[in-house]
Amino acid sequence: MPDTRPGLTFDESGVCAACINSEEQKTTNWNERFNQLKSICDKYRGSNGNGYDCAIAVSGGKDSHFQTYIMKEVMKMNPILLSVGNIDWTETGRKNLENLSDTFSCEIIQLQPNWHVTRILTRKAFEDRGQPSWYPDSLIYAFPYRMAMQLGVKLLVYGEDVNYTYGGKYNKETPSAMLQPSNDVVQPYSKKWLEDNEITEKDLYSTISPSVEECKKFGLEPIYLSYFVPWNSVHNYEVAKRWGFRHLDHEYKREGSIDNYDQIDSLSYLLNPYLKYLKFAHSIATDNASRWIRYGLKTREEMIPIVEEIDKRLDQGIVDKFCEFVQMSPREFWKIMDKWYNREFFEQDRDGVWHPKFKVGLGLIK
């Protein structure tokens, strides 16, 4: 991973935490970890009588299929799936979520965000933080915890510990997802968003995760499945395909990504990861390429020219869907985008076009 990623640390040899952690996992006793997962499932299986044994936070994507496969088919648990709806759904994403329920015979409780509030907060977070998906991301973090407790379900299953996989605030491997809501992926809302009275604190209630104290008092045990089984996004995709998951190419060939199966539920949502390119000089293609290199599927030399070409692209469909939803003109959109270009990595010509001052794999070019 590049050294511009926030929170990422490096050792004295210049190796990033994500690569160090990946190497450490090659010596992990996965049989022992798998048996630990079995013990946890044995503890909760049947704990609610004929009710739900566990809750799984899902989107309908490849990892959601893998999680549900492990918990339902392998562990023989009776899960309830908890999901948050999108601003706009791709048809592929919608069908994949339906497939998750149909193929694994699971019920899904989905929180459909308040569209009026979503439109307002999407615009505010875009203008103020360059994080247009702040509102749905906050719901994704908070909703499963609250809903699991409301249902009386004590085992909550998440997929990947992103802080450990990619490096971040909590760069220590742990089975517990108790601290996930405070891992800095989603920051608290800004008080100034309330100043014009378009929204109130009541509108933001669903974005607030229960405290650690609340979770412990209830007896909630949130876990990362990636602690107990090897986590590989390509392998997860191959497993998901065997259970009916479909990639996006049947519907849409997008720009700016080197795969067709990751984050395919919504187009407008992808503006958020693209903004990483403006701020930190890398985006989705870098993330995926780094994983493929760590998995041993590709070499760094193979991926550098691909990332150089792909990472900078913003799919027009993303812009169209986003502007349509927030009721913003393309001119207004690009004026806000200009605000988020990092002048350390980009320079703007007299016509307003931005040009990178760096080369992938080399850094800044003087």
Give the label of every model feature segment.
Residues 66-67:
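Hydrophobic positions on the alpha1 helix immediately C-terminal to the Walker A/P-loop
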Residues 1-54, 70-366:
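Nucleotide-activated chemistry modules centered on ATP-dependent adenylation/adenylyltransferase
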Residues 54-63:
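Short, glycine-rich nucleotide/cofactor-binding loops
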